[in-house]
């Protein structure tokens, strides 16, 4: 079975506004110009037309692309536990109807997989499998889709504490698939880093990702199950950094073991095509999966210290988030934001959250300053940096956008002390981008946020 390597997504992480009406052409350009072999049609928290999977299939087939063989359309549907039930069911129907069209037009199955976001229990997955089967069966009775065609679910696991237990979760997922009548030998698992970083901080989410990829590699070596991991990462280090032209090589090595990686919006719209090609080459390089030990205690401590660090600023970040524009047809984060469990904080979704910290003068990767200091004090920093070898390069990159003046004015002096101490521990002398910092220190509107994002090469 052919497994795609590059998944083009509709993340609102670019400074360029893309409307839902432009996304069909965007998908075809991703196939033809960017070398992506999979396009995610996104319904999670997003007002995407239900005809879009079918429309992408129509345009791709008209251009002679081998849809269903080397090119795929993969919708991400709303989790019915978290969003409107009706939207979840309609997006599943859109996936099945896209296959009805592609089978009638070309005898191929355009949609082989559907992504289920925020997968934290097997019951929701079983429910969605049942809904998919019911919709496919109804269309088969109308001779609108082949009876032997089925769509597999890709669980999207987006929390560090779930990712570190991924081995047992995968076994439960295979049992759930079997109970739905699917005897699988292979499954694609989507590991997301962005929402995990919002909840737990960058270093906790990165350590959990490395640990999860290691566990999946062991599962594949054992041979009982075959897993193809997808890593969902963007351009900022806080969101994985894999799409960042300055960081793609060290990040690809750090997260070795993935089969598929996302190609998000910023790397296609906010950097040059030549820089995109560097990112693509780095992602497609084959790195040997890493065999190393990551202590759960590090992840727990990093999460604890991150939450402690951001606690005083949650209200201010929610206020500043009004300056961050939406560059896709998204549902407002105030309707569909993120709750950090255990503390009941409602915060913006990952891209707006990330962009807002930059707007406050503090690149969010630097919010792990206290964990850096803790690891150093406990003689664990070398071990942590072996697990996360891209860390120093990430902090050097982020230093270009760190403004002490802006941070002190917006958030106060305590956070600046922590960050400066961590830079000293890592042996990094910040080298701020003077043009960027000058603009940032007087920024207060959405046009400022857009201009700053263009300098960085991403919105958030």
UniProtKB/Swiss-Prot annotation:
Family affiliation: Belongs to the PEPCase type 2 family.
The reaction(s) this protein catalyses: oxaloacetate + phosphate = phosphoenolpyruvate + hydrogencarbonate
Function per UniProt: Catalyzes the irreversible beta-carboxylation of phosphoenolpyruvate (PEP) to form oxaloacetate (OAA), a four-carbon dicarboxylic acid source for the tricarboxylic acid cycle.
EC number(s) stated in the UniProt entry for this protein: 4.1.1.31
InterPro entries to which the protein is assigned, alphabetical: PEP_COase_arc-type, Pyrv/PenolPyrv_kinase-like_dom
A single BP term in Gene Ontology: oxaloacetate metabolic process
Source species of the chain: Pyrobaculum aerophilum (strain ATCC 51768 / DSM 7523 / JCM 9630 / CIP 104966 / NBRC 100827 / IM2)
A Pfam family it matches: PEPcase_2
Tree of life domain: Archaea
Cofactor: Mg(2+)
Self-association state and partner proteins as the record states: Homotetramer.
Keywords: Carbon dioxide fixation, Lyase, Magnesium
Record-linked HAMAP family: PEPcase_type2
EC class: lyase
Protein name as catalogued: Phosphoenolpyruvate carboxylase
One of the record's GO molecular function terms: phosphoenolpyruvate carboxylase activity
Name of the gene: ppcA
